[in-house]
């Protein structure tokens, strides 16, 4: 499986519009890994090779999109990070154009678009938030148990529900975000629980599911999911960071 990013926020508080919809990350990235069914160690040489040349084939393009998102996640330079996400989006769009009948291109486009939204204003962010959903659903239509797309949809629903009431109303009424009315906590739970079921070894699924349980005040479920995340073996390059987040959030859970 490609590597994923934890897509939801560690902090527990209602979101303003400017703080929401930064969710293309699956998934939600891990620093450099990308290839299906590969361990972290096995992925590193392939990632380096992919980054060293301009991608041309479908597989090379979605892999390059994954690498660019992964590299951008913890990039501190705003301009460099924005450029990486723009590159990822361009690669993913080319991948989908070459092979619209495969789920990976759509998944990585949802991931890249969500990250690209980070640098944009509210109206553009809402527009891309809608595309995140569209591309994740396109991936699920082609591969109904695609864990990355399941993760994206789970976090998409959760992020909309985390918007404060005013922000959600503004997005729906004035910014073209009527589709946000479809979001629900029950769908957030359903998608993330299925992602964990399909891919139980992936820490980020359990971490983002724990955050949803936490926000729903399902404290014991949240505690169990956080503990499972902490106990997970490294699968993606940034799992050590996510494990630290899970450990701290578990400590603060009441």
Where are these regions (language model features)?
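Bacterial N-terminal signal peptides
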Residues: 19-33
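TPR/TPR-like (Sel1-like) alpha-helical repeat modules
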Residues: 133, 219-237
């Amino acid at each position: 499986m490609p590597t994923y990013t934890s897509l939801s926020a560690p902090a527990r508080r209602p979101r303003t519009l400017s703080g929401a919809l930064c969710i293309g990350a699956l998934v939600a990235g891990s620093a450099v890994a990308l290839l299906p069914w590969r361990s972290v160690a096995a992925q590193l040489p392939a990632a380096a090779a992919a980054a060293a040349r301009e991608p041309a084939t479908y597989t090379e393009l979605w892999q390059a999109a994954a690498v660019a998102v992964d590299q951008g996640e913890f990039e501190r330079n705003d301009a460099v990070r924005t450029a990486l996400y723009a590159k990822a989006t361009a690669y993913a769009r080319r991948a989908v154009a070459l092979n619209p009948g495969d789920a990976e291109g759509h998944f990585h486009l949802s991931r890249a678009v969500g990250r690209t939204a980070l640098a944009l204003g509210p109206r553009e962010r809402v527009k891309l938030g809608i595309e995140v959903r569209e591309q994740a659903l396109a991936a699920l239509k082609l591969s109904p148990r695609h864990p990355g797309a399941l993760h994206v949809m789970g976090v998409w629903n959760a992020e909309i529900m985390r918007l404060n009431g005013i922000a959600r109303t503004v997005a729906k009424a004035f910014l073209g975000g009527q589709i946000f009315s479809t979001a629900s906590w029950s769908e957030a739970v359903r998608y993330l629980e299925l992602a964990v079921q399909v891919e139980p070894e992936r820490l980020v699924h359990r971490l983002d599911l724990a955050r949803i349980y936490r926000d729903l005040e399902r404290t014991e479920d949240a505690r169990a999911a956080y503990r499972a995340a902490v106990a997970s073996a490294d699968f993606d390059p940034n799992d050590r960071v996510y494990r630290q987040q899970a450990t701290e959030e578990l400590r603060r859970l009441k």
